[in-house]
Amino acid sequence: MTAEDVRWQQRLANYQRARVQLQAAVDLQSGRPLSDLEQQGLIQAFEFTHELAWNVMKDYFVYQGQSDIAGSRDATRAAFAVQLIEDGEGWMEMITSRNQSSHTYNRATAEAIMQRVTRQYAALFAKFEQRMVALQTKAAEGLGGVDG
């Protein structure tokens, strides 16, 4: 087993932990309004989870022998092409939200991003996790990757 074999799986484990934290914030928001600090935490959890998601994609492609992924857009396009993700447009919107959240702080922008996280992105993250866990299981059973 090479470092690439293990790396994507280690990154997936980190992604899973981050996604659980994001989901906890989403669940909290569904029960009551969040304080300003909690809102910031939800957005930061989204940013962190997104960063780990595209890095899982990138590391998985390296494991598959494809090392030309340069950033989140490349990773997202490649992941959609091989059905690691289903909603390519939703993931591209997620990149836009991620960029908006990290480069500006505007209450209206933050609230719009929080709505997208709770209504769309959290579910996309969960579906991606399910797909990658299934591939991890196949890899452990020696059945290969996306095509295996």
Sequence positions of predicted segments:
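Solvent-exposed interaction patches of small proteins and small membrane subunits
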Residues: 1-148
